[in-house]
């Protein structure tokens, strides 16, 4: 581990002796971000995103950045809540968990040094768990012979291979939320294979003391919001957004790698499916994604995390007061 990274850990340990961090998690369409932004405005906080796709610039509508949520009116004044780890990478690159963990520690310590309160907010459970538990991760090099041997295998077979590797590793990484394409599954197999061949202690980095808030949304309401939001995003130009990325020269397979909106809209733009087929398949995929997110969060609870669930339909003021009571 580089010496400068070790030095940052000492600062991190010092920063961790302060107030508990607040983590706000929940499935897609549960309304996490407005809660995090409002809370930050009231406690002098800054929001750290835990979303594996919002790191990419110019991928705004499809990833649901909703940056307007960070602009609030407080006491008749307009304020912008600081946010982090959004728009930090170029489309076409592949941001990974190892990079996120390092970026999180840097941002977390900077917020603490300035006397502000960090609020981790997102739906990528693997990212959240990795930083809260301080999992030791390593950058995994490409294994071209392995990739060549996996090329052409269907996603179902790749998923079975990954499940077997995870069982051998005792790994909590790479659930099906993160491997919804063959390219992503092959990379996950590559990582799990490397970790199996190069075992390291799972916990070497400092964990983060955090109170965890879950935004609990009724299944039927969640499904209704997902469908309504998808229609709105398409009306707001999501297809044009993906088309612009393709015109930049970003390969279609790279956009498909990002999954969900970018996968299905790219398939539509490359004439693999009709518009109606794209909408129906994408709608189903997002519903399945939300279900898998909840499965991950329930798994976190089984692994010892305490999540305080708050009803998504409560008025914002009640949500904020409830979180403050738990935090203080």
Where are these regions (language model features)?
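Positively charged N-terminal leader segments that act as targeting/secretion signals
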Residues: 1-10
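Phosphate/pyrophosphate-binding catalytic cores of soluble transferases and nucleic-acid-acting enzymes
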Residues: 10-328
């Amino acid at each position: 581990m580089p010496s400068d990274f070790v030095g940052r850990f000492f600062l991190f340990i010092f920063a961790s002796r302060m107030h508990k961090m607040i983590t706000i998690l929940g499935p897609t369409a549960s309304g996490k971000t407005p809660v995090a932004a409002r809370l930050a405005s009231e406690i002098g906080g800054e929001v750290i995103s835990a979303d594996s796709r919002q790191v990419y610039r110019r991928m705004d509508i499809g990833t649901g950045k909703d940056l307007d949520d960070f602009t609030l009116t407080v006491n008749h004044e307009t304020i912008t809540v600081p946010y982090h780890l959004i728009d930090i990478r170029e489309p076409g690159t592949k941001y990974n968990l190892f990079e996120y963990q390092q970026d999180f520690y840097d941002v977390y310590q900077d917020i603490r040094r300035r006397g502000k309160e960090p609020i981790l907010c997102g739906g990528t459970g693997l990212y959240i768990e990795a930083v809260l538990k301080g999992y030791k991760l390593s950058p995994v090099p490409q294994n071209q012979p392995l990739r060549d041997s996996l090329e052409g295998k269907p996603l179902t077979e790749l998923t079975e291979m990954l499940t077997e590797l995870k069982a051998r590793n005792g790994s909590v990484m790479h659930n099906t939320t993160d491997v919804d394409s063959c390219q992503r599954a092959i990379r996950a197999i590559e990582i799990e294979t490397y970790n199996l061949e190069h075992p390291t202690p799972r916990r070497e980095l400092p964990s983060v003391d955090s109170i965890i808030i879950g935004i609990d949304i009724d299944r039927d309401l969640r499904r209704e919001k997902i469908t309504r939001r998808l229609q709105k995003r398409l009306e707001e130009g999501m297809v044009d957004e993906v088309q612009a990325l393709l015109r930049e020269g970003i390969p279609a397979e790279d956009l498909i790698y990002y999954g969900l909106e970018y996968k299905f809209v790219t398939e539509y733009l490359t004439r693999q499916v009709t518009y109606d087929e794209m909408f129906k398949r994408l709608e189903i995929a997002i519903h399945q994604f939300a279900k898998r997110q909840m499965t991950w969060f329930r798994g976190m609870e089984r692994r010892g995390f305490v999540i305080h669930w708050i009803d998504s339909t409560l008025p914002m003021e009640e949500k904020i007061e409830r979180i403050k009571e738990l935090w203080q």
